[in-house]
């Protein structure tokens, strides 16, 4: 078991984007970011501004988050996860409830972050959106890894789940 100081070190390196998003609807986007920045011990608006730029949002963010589109909410949630400049991102369903254009824009942002050296883990039911942007795909079933590949192959394709079942190739 990690000691509390080691655990804090690990946590400081991880950014988490929850599903559903952990944002306060009555607060503006900037107020949300300032609030969460304080929880990380970050003062001033510079890190908030950097997080906003990283997800390509309007820097003003004066409207209450409750008035944002789903795409903007997801970007805000990602900005929140980036506040402390983590090395690792854990993203839970980042494309849920967003239109295809917004999802593709987010994939582009994630690819830029990956290229900048961040390690990104995405949990999604829309893995096809990450085709060409992910280094590895891992499929899980009942908590077990059932497939790993360097490219996206739908589980119901000839090289997907059916092939695994017929050939007995499982990582269980």
Predicted regions and their residues:
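H-loop/switch region of ABC-family ATPase nucleotide-binding domains
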Residues: 124-125
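Hydrophobic anchor residue at the start of the ABC signature
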Residues: 78
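Helix N-cap at the start of a conserved alpha-helix in ABC-type nucleotide-binding domains
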Residues: 100-102
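Conserved catalytic motifs of ABC-family nucleotide-binding domains
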Residues: 85
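Conserved ABC ATPase "signature" region
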Residues: 34, 45-60
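Catalytic Walker B motif of ABC-type/P-loop ATPase nucleotide-binding domains
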Residues: 89-92
């Amino acid at each position: 078991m990690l000691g509390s100081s080691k655990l804090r070190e690990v946590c400081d390196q991880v950014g988490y984007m929850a599903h559903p998003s952990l944002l306060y609807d009555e607060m503006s986007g900037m107020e949300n970011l300032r609030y969460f920045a304080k929880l990380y011990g970050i003062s001033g608006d510079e890190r908030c501004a950097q997080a906003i730029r990283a997800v390509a949002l309007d820097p003003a963010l004066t409207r209450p988050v409750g008035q944002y589109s789903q795409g903007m909410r997801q970007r805000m949630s990602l900005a929140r996860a980036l506040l402390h400049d983590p090395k690792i991102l854990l993203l839970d369903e980042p494309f849920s409830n967003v239109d295809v254009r917004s999802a593709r824009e987010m994939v582009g942002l994630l690819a830029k972050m990956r290229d900048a050296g961040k390690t990104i883990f995405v949990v999604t039911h829309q893995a096809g959106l990450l085709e060409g942007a992910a280094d590895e795909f891992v499929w899980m079933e009942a908590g077990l890894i059932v497939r790993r590949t360097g490219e996206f192959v739908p589980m119901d394709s000839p090289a997907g789940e059916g092939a695994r079942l017929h050939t007995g190739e499982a990582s269980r």
